[in-house]
């Protein structure tokens, strides 16, 4: 009997496969295609203290082996989220991870405080989205600001805290150490890489926001490299993401040192990606005669 269970800061997941924030709604949108009970966890779309309208359109465009998005963290706000989305997810046997966004330290803390007594398992703090003009980018790209906001958020949190790191920095390990120093329980990486696309026929930017976050298969080698670097630099468990579309992709991250993985852009071109990866991991373990998936974590030194 193979064991696919992994543990993140004392929270046990039935397997290491989760959704990535912003690509799976809050689960309801995919529940017709995906048996949410099969997933290790569902990471919700980012939620703020008040509703956000998001950026003007166009907000999404395709790139070679990927996409650019500048959604702007459109969300219904924490109050509606708690009334509508958490009760829906509680119907399923999967861990609930709420992604939190904000434009100031106070915004983040307000959301975290409201979630303190809700039946959610982990909180992922989004300090790295590159398409919001205020707030997040400054926290995610400055180690002092990142350490400070981690400390503040921890004061209000009852659940373990995941700090989601931006790849748009000179040294990802410096940011990882800053989050660790601030008291983070878990790190997740990478968020999207900042990119741009020009519409040569309209002679303007493809996105109304000019820049957007690049994701999809094209970013995977960068993400695997950064996950490996971070696992060598800190003692925290890591959730790896960035271009994961198959079990083989997920295994690269796990072997590089990630305890769990998040599947994002793949959900758009293959709604069944997450459960296919769950099955693919089990199949690989059986073929390779690996009894416990934890034996594969960080096997590449």
Regions found by a protein language model. Give the residues of each.
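Short, surface-exposed connector motifs at secondary-structure boundaries
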Residues: 11-14, 91-96, 156-161, 232-236, ...
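Hydrophobic faces of well-ordered beta-strands that scaffold small-molecule active sites
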Residues: 17-20, 40-44, 96-100, 123-125, ...
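Short gly/pro/ser/thr-enriched loop/turn and capping motifs at secondary-structure boundaries
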Residues: 48-53, 130-132, 194-197, 268-270
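Alpha/beta enzyme core
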Residues: 32, 103-239, 245-256
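N-terminal capping/small domains of soluble enzymes
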Residues: 1-96, 102
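Structural signal for hydrophobic packing residues in well-ordered secondary-structure cores
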Residues: 93, 116-119, 157, 281-289
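C-terminal helical cap(s) of enzyme catalytic domains, especially alpha/beta-barrels
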Residues: 54-64, 198-212, 254, 266-291
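A short, charged, Gly/Pro-tolerant segment at domain boundaries
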Residues: 294-301
